[in-house]
Design a protein with these regions (language model features):
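Feature marks hydrolase-like catalytic cores characterized by long aromatic- and Gly/Pro-rich stretches
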Residues: 36-39, 49-187
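Membrane-embedded translocation segments of transport machinery
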Residues: 2-36, 41-74
Length: 187
């Protein structure tokens, strides 16, 4: 089903992200049948709209509903073709938001959460450290972990996630640092 329930309107809406993942699942299925002649495949799909600023609360809820629906759809599709244990799906973005308001929403930040899904993934684990939050009011937070203006430095970078998956594909440590030059900034 390529429709998801929009948490704001309560209406079912078309999911372009789920449609992209439908194409990926079909391509994986063709690869399993030996029609493509490749051993490992990499696919990229995208969902924009995360530059929310002052519309963050309602817009972010809808965006996360789209991601949740599309990942569930893809997991179901992979299960139907017997590929769930052979596919790792992950989100990757260096785009985050600040924790503090700029008076009209939040600004661009460095820290963000990523999801990893697949039959070979040890689920339920969180990597990195969640920042300490101190409530200033019902909708305002502060943190001693801020660098400045509400920006947080991530403890686990998207580069580390990408390098881990790259090593699975056969990258050496030296190649990983060439592909992900910020690796040296994280331990």
């Amino acid at each position: 089903k390529l429709q998801y329930p929009n948490p704001l309107s309560g209406q079912n809406e078309f999911s372009a992200l789920a449609q992209q993942l439908q194409v990926v699942a079909r391509t994986i299925q063709a690869g399993q049948a030996g029609k493509l002649g490749v051993k490992r495949q990499v696919f990229f799909v995208s969902l924009g709209g995360f530059d929310t600023h002052n519309n963050q609360n309602p817009t972010h809820a809808d965006l996360l509903a789209r991601v949740a629906h599309a990942m569930r759809y893809f997991d179901t599709a992979l299960g139907a073709i017997g590929a769930r244990n052979n596919v790792t799906t992950f989100t990757a973005s260096d785009f985050g938001r600040t924790f503090t308001s700029n008076g009209d929403g939040t600004d661009h930040g460095w820290g963000a959460h990523q999801f990893v899904m697949g039959g070979a993934v040890r689920g339920g684990d969180l990597y990195g450290a969640f920042p300490t939050l101190v409530a200033k009011s019902s909708n305002e937070f502060d943190s001693p972990d801020q660098v400045r203006n509400g920006a947080m430095l991530p403890t686990t970078s998207v580069d580390q996630l990408g390098a881990t998956l790259g090593r699975w594909f056969g990258l050496s440590d030296g190649q990983a640092t060439q592909v992900f030059p910020n690796l040296a900034n994280f331990n």
